[in-house]
Amino acid sequence: MSYLLVAIVCLLTSLGQLCQKQAAECWRRLPVAQRQRVTFGWLMLAALLLGIGLLLWLLVLQHLPLGVAYPLLSINFVLVTLLAHYGFGERVDRHHWWGIALIVIGIYLMQGE
């Protein structure tokens, strides 16, 4: 159950980051008249997702040692990279993909007790 909560926390915080990116993009490209309203909506959604993620993280910390739980959050780097690449069309070079692979391997190795 604790690992499921960690996965949910990672998903919520990654989506929160993407909402912040969307807010920044809206601020940059929308006319001034629409900018505040649309950006505010994305920022509120980001705050909601990150806030729920924080509350669930507190539950995780009640059940897993910090030294086990915290490294699992590095999956956020993987999720944000994938979502940014496929959702925003951001370019991810070969070195970045190698870094992502090493993060996944590191998470696997740390959990192999």
From Swiss-Prot:
GO terms for biological process: lipid A biosynthetic process; lipopolysaccharide biosynthetic process. It is a multi-pass membrane protein. Pathway: Bacterial outer membrane biogenesis; lipopolysaccharide biosynthesis. It comes from the Bacteria. Keywords: Cell inner membrane, Cell membrane, Lipid A biosynthesis, Lipid biosynthesis, Lipid metabolism, Lipopolysaccharide biosynthesis, Membrane, Transmembrane, Transmembrane helix, Transport. InterPro entries: EamA_dom, Flippase_ArnE, Small_drug/metabolite_transptr. This is Probable 4-amino-4-deoxy-L-arabinose-phosphoundecaprenol flippase subunit ArnE. The gene is arnE.
